Design a protein with these regions (language model features):
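Metal/cofactor-centered catalytic core regions of large enzymes
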Residues: 1-209
Length: 209
């Protein structure tokens, strides 16, 4: 259960990152509307974080062995609202940009990075995958129960600004799917198991004398 909650927190962070990156690419390309479409959901993610741990940006709920506290019912309600409402807005955002001729003219061929150069420079994440490298640590070296989830790895071809934009968009869909799966798995825990948020270990150890 704790691993699934960790995955939810991490994938919300991925979406929060990608939506700000892609909406700002739109602003820099002369299209402000997309920024307004997505930022309201970045705010909703921060509201979830605030409900979970009291912090909007730095999720300080994590501890060795679990969390500092359990998720509240309000946090789950806000999460469910995000899962239900975000897909429609993300789809609208894609309709605004993905095949927009002006946006494509301003991003295709801009700042291309080859797969070889991306590896040599130590690129990771969507920038690496946009360059055509099919690698995601969540799949190739799974941690925190990622092996329990079904999702794809979006990969680009040219590593230009447009590819990076598309990969991030596709990753948001994959993250949304992971969050949905994790939310369903968390709901399967009943009774006392539904209250587990930390390993059964002492809060601290005293050193040997």
């Amino acid at each position: 259960r704790v691993d699934y909650l960790r995955v939810i927190i991490m994938e919300l962070a991925r979406i929060a990152d990608h939506l700000i990156c892609n909406s700002i690419v739109g602003v820099d390309s002369g299209a402000y509307s997309g920024f307004l479409y997505l930022m309201q959901f970045r705010e909703l993610i921060y509201e979830i974080y605030e409900e979970v741990c009291g912090s909007r940006l730095t999720t300080n709920i994590g501890r060795i062995g679990g969390f500092e506290r359990n998720f509240t019912n309000t946090a789950f309600e806000k999460l469910e609202k995000f899962i239900k409402e975000y897909p429609a807005v993300l789809k609208e955002f894609e309709n605004l940009f993905n095949r927009n001729r002006i946006f494509m003219d301003r991003t295709i061929g801009c700042g291309p990075i080859s797969a070889e150069r991306a590896l040599n420079y130590g690129f990771t994440g969507p920038n690496l995958r946009a360059a055509g490298v099919d690698y995601d640590v969540r799949v190739h070296t799974p941690y925190s129960s990622y092996e329990d989830f079904q999702f794809d790895i979006p990969v680009g071809t040219t590593g230009d600004c447009y590819d990076r934009f598309l990969v991030r968009n596709q990753e948001m869909w994959q993250s949304l799917s992971i969050i949905e799966q994790a939310f369903k798995k968390v709901q399967e825990f009943k009774g006392a198991e539904a209250d587990v948020y930390h390993a059964d270990v002492p809060e601290y150890y005293l050193p040997d004398k």
